[in-house]
Regions:
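Short beta-strand/loop motif that positions the catalytic acidic residue
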Residues: 100, 106-108
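Short, conserved loop/helix-junction motifs that constitute active-site signature segments
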Residues: 97-101, 124-128
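Alpha/beta-hydrolase-fold enzymes
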Residues: 1-68
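Conserved alpha/beta-hydrolase "acid-adjacent" motif
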Residues: 89, 108-119
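Active-site nucleophile elbow and catalytic-triad environment of alpha/beta-hydrolase enzymes
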Residues: 9, 14-15, 78-96, 102
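Catalytic histidine-centered segment of alpha/beta-hydrolase-like enzymes
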Residues: 139-152
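C-terminal alpha-helix
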Residues: 157-168
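Catalytic histidine neighborhood in serine/cysteine hydrolases
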Residues: 126-142
Length: 168
């Protein structure tokens, strides 16, 4: 799972906690510029393949090649307005996990550097007793999207889980 609000707010693996106020100030400033017609866009990774291979987190290394090279949509820019960071930082997938009262299956790669977000959300899903965290052995986050052996394993798990809990 990828909690985009948490990452926009705290940085990946909570690595930018000390710059939250600075980034909010930049978003507020961007909103002022938008009033004058100057929209500031952020988000694209202008990297060479060699630079991408050196990124510190597997999510970003794998994500660069998946989203920018092998599976990129021709119309995607990967950009968003800097002012929207205020809203993006405010949203958090974990906030209402306790309200889930239906069967819940969460799937994550067991070696994924995003797993901390899945683990945190799963712990907060206290509204259902029918829940399971399924770990895909050897998988990183992005690999769970497209690597056939992982996708097939996930599809089988989805069939098993929802076959058990969904009424026919």
């Amino acid at each position: 799972m990828f909690n985009s609000g948490r990452v926009r707010r705290n940085g990946f693996q909570d690595s930018q906690m000390d710059t939250i106020q600075q980034r909010l100030a930049q978003a507020a400033e961007a909103r002022t510029f938008e009033k004058e017609g100057d929209v500031r866009l952020v988000g694209a990774m202008n990297l060479t393949d060699e630079q991408a291979k050196k990124l510190p987190f597997a999510l970003y290394r794998n994500g660069f090649f998946y989203y920018f090279r092998t599976h990129a949509h021709p119309n995607s820019t990967f950009l968003y307005t800097q002012s929207s960071l205020m809203d993006l930082m405010n949203w958090d997938v974990d906030d209402r996990m306790a309200m889930i009262h239906q069967p819940l299956l969460m799937i994550a790669g067991d070696v994924s550097d995003t797993r901390y977000m899945t683990d945190d959300a799963f712990k907060k899903a206290t509204g259902t007793k029918d829940k399971e965290l399924y770990l895909v052995k050897g998988a990183q986050h992005i690999e769970t999207y497209w690597v056939p052996k992982y996708v097939n394993e996930e599809a089988a798990k989805l069939q098993e889980f929802f076959g058990k809990y969904l009424k026919k």
